[in-house]
């Protein structure tokens, strides 16, 4: 008998007995319990994820009124580090409504934030494409036309105290200084955004030079890196203190998730910090997308909710609303869907207004919170790894400009409103009633001895 035949028989014998052993002693699996959907580097939390379990998660809830009721059952993460707060060394959760937790330290006073342009600035210049960097250029142009951010960076406040060797916010400060080199009316010449490109690996380790990336993903990691820069001189800060950084003052807000028991009608409120809103692109308008975002989901059948008040699994409703509105509202349309290793794009037109009231989508529907459009980022192409990004931005003199890498041209509001938008940037209108405050359903109490609870996962 040949050696090959013996080896073949040995292999057949081993396979047969391995299968027999497996059938006699099968591997027993159990459902995994995860704290959030899997995403790159574990930074961001997917909102309204239809596959997300609502029963088997560790969680906590916040009081539903100023009387600070006892905790009731909840089934999702809340008041958690949002995108933009990673890297500060804290994974603790707090047990209370953000209205009841005064910050131990104020990093950036709210009254110093300037929402309107202090001066008419020269129009920002174009940015040279360094090789598949249109995703970066289009985001940088949006940020370079955001009044509170630009005016903070031009003041040079951050670099005066920064001690980081590789600081993304310092590089952004330098970038803005190049875009607005003087207070004259002459536009600067197009330049290479090499300072930001050289920080791609710092912004996120999976970014590669000269490779097309997703503009929204880059934006979120960029803002996240700015937040790290804001916190680098401050250790062991509580959540409320971290969220008084200039980054959160500009882009930050809160979501509220409310689960309402169908039996006892007792609500369970949980809160989460936000830096942008990602909404579905299935409707025909921004209003459709926002309505879908705040639409109440039924928890029933295999997805019932365990109510701590009723001490049993019950039918319930779950609704996400905006609890505190940000000063700069960034809205991302989820145009890309992924199936295995391929992605496809929802290319239909979605209408959006020049101004709108966010009030109907807030936790208190009686609130009035008006926004005006200041930027639109567009993706032309069929997937995140191909195509081209460009943006439309409203300049300090009210003129709309199109930024297509190093080419800058005048535009109009009619043309701006007729784009296949991927990202919208809105600025909160300055009125006496639209200050950066928590939703009025709760009253902020300025006490320093509030009990805080940390829960580790």
UniProtKB/Swiss-Prot annotation:
Taxonomic superkingdom: Eukaryota
Main EC class the enzyme belongs to: hydrolase
Assigned keywords, A-Z: Hydrolase, Phosphoprotein, Protease, Thiol protease, Ubl conjugation pathway
Compositionally biased intervals (Basic residues): 448-457
Listed Gene3D superfamilies: Cysteine proteinases (3.90.70.10)
Presence of keyword Cell cycle: no
Catalytic reaction annotation: Thiol-dependent hydrolysis of ester, thioester, amide, peptide and isopeptide bonds formed by the C-terminal Gly of ubiquitin (a 76-residue protein attached to proteins as an intracellular targeting signal)
GO molecular function per UniProt: cysteine-type deubiquitinase activity; deubiquitinase activity; metal-dependent deubiquitinase activity
Entry-annotated residues carrying Phosphoserine: 61, 65
Modified residue annotations for Phosphothreonine: 64
Keyword Oxidoreductase: no
Biased composition (Polar residues): 45-67
GO biological process annotation, one example: protein deubiquitination
Protein EC: 3.4.19.12
InterPro entries, per database record: Papain-like_cys_pep_sf, Peptidase_C19, Peptidase_C19_UCH, USP_CS, USP_dom
List of catalytic residues: 134, 388
Record region (Disordered): 34-97, 434-457
Boundaries of every USP domain copy: 125-429
This protein's GO CC annotations: cytosol; nucleolus; nucleus
Family recorded in the similarity comment: Belongs to the peptidase C19 family.
PANTHER family named among the record's database cross-references: UBIQUITIN CARBOXYL-TERMINAL HYDROLASE (PTHR24006), UBIQUITIN CARBOXYL-TERMINAL HYDROLASE 36 (PTHR24006:SF758)
Official protein name in the record: Probable ubiquitin carboxyl-terminal hydrolase 16
Gene from which the chain derives: ubp16
């Amino acid at each position: 008998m040949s050696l090959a035949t013996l080896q073949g028989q040995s292999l057949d014998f081993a396979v047969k007995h391995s299968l027999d052993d497996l059938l006699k002693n099968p591997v027993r699996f159990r459902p995994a319990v995860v704290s959030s959907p899997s995403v790159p580097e574990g930074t961001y939390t997917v909102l309204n994820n239809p596959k997300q379990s609502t029963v088997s998660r560790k969680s906590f809830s916040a009081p539903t009124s100023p009387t600070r009721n006892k905790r009731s059952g909840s089934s999702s993460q809340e008041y958690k580090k949002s995108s933009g707060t990673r890297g500060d060394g804290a994974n603790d959760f707090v047990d209370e409504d953000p209205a009841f937790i005064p910050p131990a330290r104020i990093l950036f006073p709210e009254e110093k934030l300037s929402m309107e342009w202090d001066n008419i600035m020269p129009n920002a210049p174009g940015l040279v494409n360094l090789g598949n960097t249109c995703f970066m250029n289009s985001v940088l142009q949006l940020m370079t036309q955001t009044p509170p951010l630009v005016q903070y960076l031009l003041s040079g406040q951050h670099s005066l105290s920064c001690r980081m060797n590789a600081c993304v916010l310092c590089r952004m400060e330098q970038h803005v200084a190049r875009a607005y080199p003087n207070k004259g009316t002459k536009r600067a010449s197009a330049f290479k955004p090499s300072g930001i490109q050289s920080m791609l690996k710092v912004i996120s380790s999976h970014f590669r030079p000269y490779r097309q990336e997703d503009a929204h993903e880059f934006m979120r990691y960029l803002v996240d890196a700015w937040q790290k820069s804001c916190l680098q001189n401050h250790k062991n800060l509580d959540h409320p203190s971290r969220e008084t950084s200039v980054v959160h003052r500009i882009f930050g807000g809160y979501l509220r998730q409310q689960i309402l028991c169908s039996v006892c009608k007792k609500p369970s409120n949980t809160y989460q910090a936000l830096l942008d809103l990602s909404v579905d692109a299935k409707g025909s308008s921004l209003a459709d997308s926002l309505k879908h975002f705040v639409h109440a989901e039924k928890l029933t059948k295999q997805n019932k909710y365990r109510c701590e008040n009723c001490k049993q699994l019950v039918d319930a409703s779950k609704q996400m609303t905006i609890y505190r509105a940000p000063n700069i509202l960034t809205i991302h349309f989820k145009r890309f869907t992924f199936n295995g290793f391929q992605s496809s794009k929802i290319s239909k037109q979605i209408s959006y207004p020049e101004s709108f009231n966010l009030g109907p989508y807030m936790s208190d529907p009686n609130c009035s919170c008006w926004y005006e459009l200041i930027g639109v980022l567009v993706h032309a192409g069929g997937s995140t790894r191909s195509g081209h990004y460009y943006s439309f931005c409203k300049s300090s003199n009210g003129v709309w400009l199109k930024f297509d890498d190093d080419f800058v041209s005048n535009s109009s509001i009619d043309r701006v409103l007729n784009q296949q938008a991927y990202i919208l940037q809105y600025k909160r209108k300055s009125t006496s009633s639209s200050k950066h405050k928590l939703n009025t359903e709760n009253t902020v109490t300025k006490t320093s001895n509030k009990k805080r609870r940390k829960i580790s996962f």
